[in-house]
């Protein structure tokens, strides 16, 4: 019995991340090789962007993906999000030269307020929303607040890129395959303040912390390398990380939809007070996923250094949220 197609809305669909993402969704990498999809693609309603989107859709057609059951181009979130089962909010305004962070927050605040309202009005009541566009945590917070009729838990922010970056650095340090690393956590904001935490991580049952046994490397090499990786890629490539961001979005949605079999992954989710994080703060936590739901890993001990790192990233997030309070 073949499955009924699900509707996947993607914003910023003709952008760099969108281009790296759509073909993988259409091939079944995100929701499974037996799940047909209808892509509902949103771009800004400007002639150049809509024309570029048409070109991407022509390429998608030319792949003849068996699972691609339909495609639509949109310039308005009210039509793009209609009955959406999944929404990947990729499009956001990047920070331009000389632009203050407050200005960036304000511009994106308006975008994500409108998108949250549209999701609230027309999306499936079970829609799973992933915000990729930066500042991802705060944009997800804004969208969630603009959608009071949808469950808070349906809104998430992407911390998976930080998680994957941390895993690859640990693999390089230990000489072990990245697939062998279990129970890694990333806490907080998708920004250089995020706290990648391998205190509970294992490789083949052995403690990664004991294996590395180097707090100076952790503090002075590992955390800054993971935190500033995005900037290092811009410096090297002249463009921001698009393919790795798209890959992380696929990982995040696949695990949320299909489950992690007990494995820990990192998602930015609205807090309910876990680990002392105030309610509603969109915060990176270690989670497990099953039956289409995520659950924060509880009962983890937080030592003094970890608490200091968590407090720092929380303070940054609360500062961002205070900066958009007037939009909500």
Curated annotation (Swiss-Prot):
Keyword flag Cytoplasm: no
Annotated substrate binding sites: 95, 101, 134, 165
Reaction equations catalysed: (S)-malate + NAD(+) = oxaloacetate + NADH + H(+)
Domain of life: Bacteria
Keywords on record: NAD, Oxidoreductase, Tricarboxylic acid cycle
Enzyme Commission designation: 1.1.1.37
Signal sequence residues: none
Molecular function GO terms recorded: L-malate dehydrogenase (NAD+) activity
GO biological process, alphabetically ordered: malate metabolic process; tricarboxylic acid cycle
Database matches in Gene3D superfamilies: Lactate dehydrogenase/glycoside hydrolase, family 4, C-terminal, NAD(P)-binding Rossmann-like Domain
Binding site for NAD(+): 12-18, 108, 115, 132-134
Keyword Magnesium among UniProt keywords: no
Active site per UniProt: 190 (proton acceptor)
Listed InterPro entries: L-lactate/malate_DH, Lactate/malate_DH_C, Lactate/malate_DH_N, Lactate_DH/Glyco_Ohase_4_C, Malate_DH_type2, NAD(P)-bd_dom_sf
Similarity comment: family membership: Belongs to the LDH/MDH superfamily. MDH type 2 family.
Function: Catalyzes the reversible oxidation of malate to oxaloacetate.
Protein name: Malate dehydrogenase
Lineage, top ranks: Bacteria, Pseudomonadati, Pseudomonadota, Betaproteobacteria, Burkholderiales
